């Protein structure tokens, strides 16, 4: 199996592994901000000396499951991959240099539910080795009087659920 195929398989397994679990159990929470009307995804992992971005998948959540709306993978460092620092964000729909766009971006529609899964490889002083980490965030696009804006959906620990009502 090629390095690229291994990379994709690892990403798919990590995302599938966390699809129905709480954000703090098997995945860490990703951040979402807004840039030019689109979501911009970030990870905050202060223990990592280096974060290597492997890929990002964004899905629409429906009653029937999930539908991919954007997917990008990045080459591993030995193949010239770019490094992601905790302060940067990945803007939805951008074609990044050296990245492979597996699924071109679909328009994000107000009132629909979305989830983002970001896979990174991190090096930390504690482990002295590379490990894979999955970051997850749920969001929606909400229309107000003047425009459409991004809303990150919080995880409610006591209720063991996502607070999707903020998107209504």
PLM segments and residue spans:
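N-terminal export/targeting and maturation segments
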Residues: 20-78
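Boundary-flanking segments of nucleic-acid-binding domains in nuclear regulatory proteins
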Residues: 65-67, 95, 135
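Extended, polar beta-sheet/loop recognition surfaces of beta-rich domains
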Residues: 21-27, 47, 121-168
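Sec-dependent bacterial lipoprotein signal peptides
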Residues: 1-20
């Amino acid at each position: 199996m090629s390095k690229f195929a291994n990379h994709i398989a690892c990403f798919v397994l990590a995302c599938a592994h966390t699809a129905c679990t709480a954000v703090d159990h098997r995945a860490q929470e990703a951040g979402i901000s807004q840039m030019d009307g689109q979501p911009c995804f970030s990870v905050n992992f202060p223990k990592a000396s280096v974060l290597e971005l492997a890929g990002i998948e964004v899905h629409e959540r429906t009653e029937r499951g999930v539908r991919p709306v954007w997917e990008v993978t990045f080459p591993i460092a030995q193949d010239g991959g770019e490094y992601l620092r905790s302060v940067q964000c990945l803007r939805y729909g951008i074609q990044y240099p050296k990245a492979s766009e597996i699924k071109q971006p679909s328009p994000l529609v107000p009132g629909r539910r979305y989830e983002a899964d970001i896979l990174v490889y991190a090096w930390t002083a504690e482990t002295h080795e590379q490990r894979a980490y999955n970051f997850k965030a749920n969001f929606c696009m909400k229309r107000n009087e003047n425009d459409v804006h991004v809303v990150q959906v919080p995880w409610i620990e006591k209720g063991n659920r996502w607070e999707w009502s903020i998107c209504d």
